[in-house]
């Protein structure tokens, strides 16, 4: 390992070739393990010519390929196994080798003088196959292309990645074990440590990753080779530890070995897929057998891998041969990368080991640099695509071949061992591993970056940096890999799920890119395949641990098998993706991101090397399938990556100071990839971010990881946004990947950062910052990520902007592609990140099979985004897939529950009506029906409370390990919620939400104020009290009934008592637990229970209405003479009219039908309590009706939210961030600019009360009835006129506030419009009666009714408009336009409510209408309409209170909505976010920008919690900036739903923590992650 440290130092300093060799060696070790598992496949593929990875390969094709891996390309077969000196071979093979060498030389010069030595050493060192470093150097033999060639290298990386992939896969199969094994063997203790760490990390991915980070830090990284004079170990703390960490690095290798086994199968495909450039790589087919065995042992994953691998071949057409031609990016750059990658490989390996030692912090940093650097560097001019194709064709993976099979086998054995361990650990901590998988994934993403799928390819294979972190350490430290195994498995999971999805996504993205860059497309598809292969192979064999874990995970239902589906979708989209993201393919250079592998901290480097090896193996397999997926082969990725890594290291270590270029280098140093410099960084960021995100993604909606990552690159993202088109065309895919990688580089390192964070700290804070941020933001448990590196990360971002300007721009495009292309293979991860970043990483990787549902949703999103990827505006498409995916069973249950509720309501109408209409029906015959309603509702409520209590203990579990719990708990516990949430907001599946939602009833994202506003629920309580009094009086009335009469029935006492209990329990349910009653587990029970309660409330309403109408009529009915006793009221009003004759036949219509044995008047209220009930009922029964209306409406909204995949569920950030941030029951009042309206309203209220008192005094005396009616009518007319004028003035004033057109029709709006119907009914009947009344002195009655109609219509419009208005500027906050009117209307509606309740509710108060319609008709009209009219006045008050309180606050939520509505393009949004950041203390805007469009305003409210995740993740990812910086974009894209909601929410997050400046991105990252963590 000494040579390894030397190599890492030299390579890190400036030797791309050495680093490449080193990484290649590591990758070989990993790949060898993988190939041990997958070598059979590799042999098969070697035998077969793997078709070049075809982005267009369908999942089915992929499966076919997996089943029957195509023979390795003739080139692969023809290529002799590369010898350790393959570096020499590589330079000759590539046409550009001189350039590569020159570039290498430059890079070496930049990085360090020792680099050349390492390059030389690489060729020389490689000769000893046993030496891991030599093996790595061999792998690195392909000299990493110089920075400028790196673009070519990037392209060539595709070729190299593919060709090397194939060879590397083979070599890795044979050689990687030595290098990895050497690491492992060299540091068995470390290996054990790694295993322990992996286990621990698997158990506590968040902790583990952080701990791993610490452990890695504590465990000195493997001694770095002496850095060149100009390079210093930026990873100081970790580098310092580098020498000791070697143990760790090896311990990582054990973990990686487990992870690699799955990769090997992919390698097989990939090996076959990429041209067999170096059969030497193929020789380790023996590992392939193991790998195959492992794959077989993990049939699900291997087939998927094969699918992934073979489909890419189909995509790329001829697997190996076609790939070389197909990789457009590969042709020219690849040759250069081959030479340069040698140094990089060597340096990378050394550095990788150092990084491995530093695994987490270094890894985190390195991948970002690589991703970015690769992207920048790799993005070659379109003309280079042909070169890439050529390069790809001739790039052999030298070191991999040369790596001894012994090492491969040993590594594989170790991997298998660890795989077993990790498998258990992984299965246990798969989610954590998957979270870690983000690292691994980030590594594959760097590979993807190298590939055409810059992020994906690099992320997938070369991305190995993060992956090496997970992968190389995976090989060298399989245990650590377990730590990373989460990463690796996450990487595998992500590779496999993410890679598969990503790879398929990548494939799609690759295919898209391929459209422009055939090679890149190939690479990407290879990456895709490789990712898939990695996902598949690693899962099964490559990373036995990861594979086993994945297998377990798939067995758990989250395995790769599930992931393949998304890849399938991805696969077909790839062609589109190609065309759409063909330019991103150009970005293929990011594949050069192989440096990310190198850039991985020493541990990361090892991990990266192992990861690269695994990735290479997987990529080779995939590469064989997807020739373009250069990253697949560690050597190929490494060659490309190494250059990037070299540059990164040089820059990072040397330039670490420079914020832009140096910062990126710093990040590179940190990330080892940053060496690639700012150029690759963009890509690298994408790839790394992508990978890292998946790893941390998995955890809590690793959007946060994405978020961090994005956040880190956020500054760049803006530039990305500006240049999104170029990236779209040339680097859209890779930019997204880059952005992802950037994020990944930042975030993935963090993801690895959980595991890789340790390594990352070793690297300059620059890289750590991104990673740290990433860990913090994405992996809520990773909050510990070095913030010191935040500046560096910012530097990265800044540096990235230049190169990543396009790249990030591409990343931006890729953000869509992230969403759309999914950032190449990694895209699946980011898409997963967007869809359910936390669950998707797990899903894509470990949970590919089982969690496919969640993952698949995200991947579908990813697939969808593939097409939309081109346009950032297509984020919505990203949002749409998350849209509720309703299962057939759920739809059926919803339908039946709705029919059941309708049946209850119809019966509630029929029973009381039949009793009143017919005299042959005994009284209270239907009371049993109401007992059934009340008791059934109470049982359901008690069940809900019980589940709420039972569920509470579970909340901490998901919270404890958000990644595991988020994905697994989400998959199981929150499966329903994830089903809903994932469906509604797949990506939204916020880890925080899963954390808090595990309970059966978890908080329904507090939409507005829960379900309905606080005032509405207060009104429900007040009306409930009145209703309980009413029921209590009815209950007492029973004891006065004569036992001998037919009216005496025990049910008459039992029903009111039961109703009283029901009202009380339901009141508690509605008022207090409304926010907590969110059903996730027992959806069918919840649907029928809620619908039963809705039916109960409506039946109560109808029953009370009919009973009260009956009793009021009977009050005036005289059974003796069968007349109505209301004549005493009429005479005063009649003025000579013969009002109602006492002629017995005059009103026989009243008792008509009462010829049966049962007369309704027999049981009327006659006794003391009966009289009291009758007198109080006009005031009490409206309370029952209004209470039932409110409860029915609230319950209906809850039922609908269950039926539809809880789109409202997106917990608001405030709910997520902190359990409740502020108690939901804490309210504050600001009376500014409300005094005039308040006191004028009080004056009107006083006049109204006086008028009512006069009315009741006069109406009691027959001679003054007319005067009483006239007095009240005049008072009403005055109030209506004043209120109408005030409403019109208010509508003019409130127009100054910002209108939110996205706000959906809310519960308050529904109740308001519904209640207004009652007012209209009453007034229309009154106008008709007044018009046909001949008396002129009564004309005030119809005029008053018309005035009431006009006033209610204006008021309804005013309320509906004002409820969508929001103050958005300081002027609004200062002037508060319209607030005086709102205050006045609030008080006036209270006055009108009093009039309606006290005066209008009594039929005898309106002699004209009573005389015109008759007693029966008018009483019925009054009892039906007046409760609604009363409720309209009350609810208008409620709505005005809500407007008064909310419209004049500058809420980030609404501002985000405003931003969304105002900002069309992401770039504009980005700028808007910048402005907001500058002007406001929150960065919610960043999430908004990232999301692009809120799904709905409703979701915004509800989405605020999402926003917490989003802001935590989206804002955390700098979501708004640069579309969330790739991952952020994807996440933001997903967050777009959620993030936009969250965007609003982001504000809701109170992202104030986020700094206002682009640099605040770091702060932002830190901030959002912190929130997420808190929410977690």
Curated annotation (Swiss-Prot):
Q: Report the transmembrane regions from the record.
A: 741-761, 891-911, 931-951, 1019-1039, 1051-1071, 1084-1104, 1179-1199, 1239-1259, 1272-1292, 1310-1330, 1340-1360, 1381-1401, 1412-1432
Give me the disulphide-bonded residues: none
- In what ranges is there compositional bias, type Basic and acidic residues? 347-356, 384-393, 420-433
Compositionally biased tracts (Acidic residues): 103-116, 159-171, 186-198, 206-216, 316-341, 402-419
Q: Where is the composition biased (Basic residues)?
A: 686-709
A GO molecular function term, named singly, is:
proton channel activity
Q: Which residues are glycosylated?
A: 230, 267, 1121, 1479
**Residue ranges of the region described as Disordered:** 1-602, 621-736, 771-845, 962-1001, 1498-1549
Keyword Transmembrane helix among UniProt keywords: yes
Write down what this protein is called. Proton channel OtopLc
> Its membrane topology, per UniProt?
Multi-pass membrane protein
**Which BP terms does GO give this entry?**
proton transmembrane transport
Q: Name one Pfam family in it.
A: Otopetrin
